[in-house]
Amino acid sequence: MASGWRALRRRILTPSMKEANLSVRGFHVKDSAARSMLETIGETFLTGYAYAVEARHPEEAEERLEQLPWQFRGFAYEGAGMGFAVRDGLPFGGHHVSRFLQGKADDHVYMVYVGIGWAMARLPRFRWAKASAAATDPVLRWLVLDGYGFHQAYFHTDRYVHRQYREPDFPWPADGPARYASRAIDQGIGRAIWFVGGADPEMAADLIDAFDESRRADLYSGAGLAATYAGAADEAELRALRRRARNYSPQVAQGGVFAGAARFRAGLVTPHTTLAAGLLCGVTPEQASDLADTSRAEAEATSAEPSGPSGVPAYELWRRRIVSGLSNLETAP
């Protein structure tokens, strides 16, 4: 009976795999290879989500996640983060995400935090506190809003991408610099634009350049992250993304560092990760990880994490430190 209930819960809560189809989404199709890659990523995310929704406990989901193809496993952990956060946000939900992060999911902590943001996009706002309770890292919590922004751009593309909607007075996190929330959401929208544009750098850049100039730095950062972590682009296309970004190429590189660091931490570095990190950032994935770690430590040492509406969170200082660190590498003899 219990297994029947878990299967029913999975059927009720899990979106159809068709939701990852580029044609269903109305996304640009660059070529069959890119389409296959992007759709496989979406399907793997939904698989991880389903594992979490159906699991008796996080350890059971972890065992199944570890059996998935390694190069896509990070997306499955992201989906599982969403699934467990949805369960935490429901009545009598529990603390599934916290328990999940005590295992192998800690290697994918960036992805799990992003998954929490997906869950928030699906839950009523009065459930957000429960769903996001495990996002206790004061720096990484902004990745939750990155996930929220990705979800909105992926599933509500016309409103958030083509009509460039921006949510006013975003209420989460309650104790963070209020004005920064929209920037973190834009970083997620930029990540989604890589998918909306079918991993075509010209299409992605055209979509980003249609936004107000004040938003483009964060959007290009997200695109750089997706181009490095998700891929589906060759060397010439990665160079085209950097060229089209123009003055925002440092932000593309910063996003690439985040992606390289995330894959290196999880032990999921692919040949594409190395290629993209080198072309967009000028570093190896291991160097990206080292730079991310040292930059975060420096940011935390100089930030009091002000809570006022005009404050700059440590997360943003971290991103700026990465940009300056890359600049120093370029000028070093």
Q: What are these language model-derived features?
A:
Residues 1-333:
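Mature, well-folded catalytic/scaffold domains that follow N-terminal targeting or propeptide regions
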